[in-house]
Amino acid sequence: ADLILAFVGEEAILSGEAHCLANLNLQGAQSGLLHRLSETGKPLVTVVMAGRPLTIGREVNISDALLYAFHPGTMGGPALANLLFGKVVPSGKLPVTFPKETGQIPIYYNHTSTGRPASGSEKNIFTIPVGAEQTSLGNTSFYLDAGKDPLFPFGYGLSYTTFAYSNLQLSSTQYTRNEVIIITFDLTNTGRTDGTEIAQLYFRDLAASVTRPVKELAAFERIHLKAGETRHIRMELPV
């Protein structure tokens, strides 16, 4: 075989109301099977079918490519075949956040700010000396063994091509209530394959009268570009 195409995940009956799991790893012998397949030396393409984000960091590391199909329905077969054989270029973005470990849950991109926001410079369990005294590490909102970042954030998704953003501009730097902020930028397909990018506009209010999320999705636009094509994009953000 030129490559290995492995389908893993969960049955649909495991998803839905009152179908919670305490362990979000791949169930049964699936993870072990993938590791054995990766040891063959053949390129490993993993397709995950599940109704929830699973903790698949180890499987991502041993796979040459991974497609998260969720539960695609009765026409999922032809759709997956078109994606895997390159008839269609992937353009989907994650509608949820994928944790590194189950213990990171709840984890989501639009959480509100805390009194101890993570800075990214915190210590972790691997940098604490053996026999260290019991004292404060100065940590904030942080997991000693998993950090603050997810495995894959909300809005993440790859393609068979690549895109570059440039020349970001705002219509003004000062606004009043009920005005509209105009955001413009250039989007370029820098790869050799035609593809579709979903441009996402996020914002954060640093001086609100009430606590606001650290990041909020305000708008998105689906843009198809031929290989090498550049397009000037305009997005609007009501104040």
Please state what every model-predicted region is.
Residues A12-E17, L54-G57, V210-T211:
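Short acidic/His/Gly/Ser-rich catalytic and metal-binding motifs that mark active-site loops
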Residues A29-L34, L44-T46, L66, L80:
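Extended, hydrophobic alpha-helical segments in both membrane/secreted and soluble proteins
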